[in-house]
Amino acid sequence: MIHPVFCRAIYFIAVSILFICASSLAQSPFQFPTANHTLFEAGNESKFFAPTAPDKPWTSGSFGCVRNNGWRLHEGLDILHLQTDKRGEPTDPVMATADGAVVYFSTRPSLSNYGNYIVIRHNIGGLEIYSLYGHLSAIRPGLKIGESVKAGELIATMGRTSNAETIAKWRAHVHFELNLLVNDNFAAWFKKASSGERNDHGEWNGQNLNGLDPREILLAEHTQGTNFNLLNFIRNQTELCRVLVRATNFPYLKRYPMLVLKNPVAEKEGVAGYEIALNFNGVAFALMPRAESEIKSRAKFQLLSVNEAEQKANPCRKLVVKRGRHWELANDGLRELELLTY
């Protein structure tokens, strides 16, 4: 058995090597969380993504409405392992995707589908984004909440932990997400909205993290180089629907002021609500303040429009539903808006 002190020494050496490697690369906002970079090799996607079963396509390990014939969301990337020990267990180092600070980790795999997982907050051009790393076998010894980490710094070891179905050795992977935080008051909202249900992770519950597609981000960054801009990427999400909310003071506005648009009418008359563009995953990527004179309904939430082509392509979040000839906010859509504006 390897002595714990020696284990820590190995970690230190590994971190040092990773720092040297990272410093030799052109700096980009995000780096791969493991040494598996085959995403950039056309035709080799099956070497990067872990599918859900041997007979399923690699796309089932990618982001979006990729499971259950398009009706189940997978909110991240399942990145395949590259190395194993003698027992066939993954040993790949997992690294921070960008400079940031550890805001949460869980070492109780029975409490989450993520198993052991870490959440890191990053500030990219003034915009806060949160990376998540799931199914870890071990978190780096001594890692603390609040600790600063550098891009490429070792934070964990890949594993197969989960409280759901067993992850087979052949598809061992790290589950990787890039998210916007929905509401600082999540714990209070959850207690009210989900009476009797447990919330073991506070505001770092997966329901409070709205995912963007890391594959699209990494590919755009690879193609655009230093011209890549995360804010522009978010602002250019495909709109699923547009809603009007009669709420004027919710945390998302303060956390993401760069997503709030200008409206001279509301600036002059006062803000009575917000017109919000949502992508298929419920990410609010454009928020327009509206004056009372611009709002036609007294309803707390009003569905203004639906992009039917996008809803057909990506229906899995079930935010809207068509009843007869008319679209309505579905229960999941109403729940998302209740959380956003709580």
Regions found by a protein language model. Give the residues of each.
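Conserved, short, structured surface segments that act as functional micro-motifs
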Residues: 112, 117-120, 147-225
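Bacterial N-terminal signal peptides
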Residues: 11-21
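N-terminal secretory signal peptides that target proteins for export/translocation
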Residues: 1-7
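Surface-exposed strand-loop junctions at beta-sheet edges and helix termini
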Residues: 97, 143-144, 149
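Surface-exposed, glycine-biased beta-strand/turn segments
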Residues: 26-116, 199-342
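Short helix/strand-bridging catalytic loops that position acidic/His residues to coordinate divalent metals
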Residues: 80-83, 131-140, 160-165, 195-201
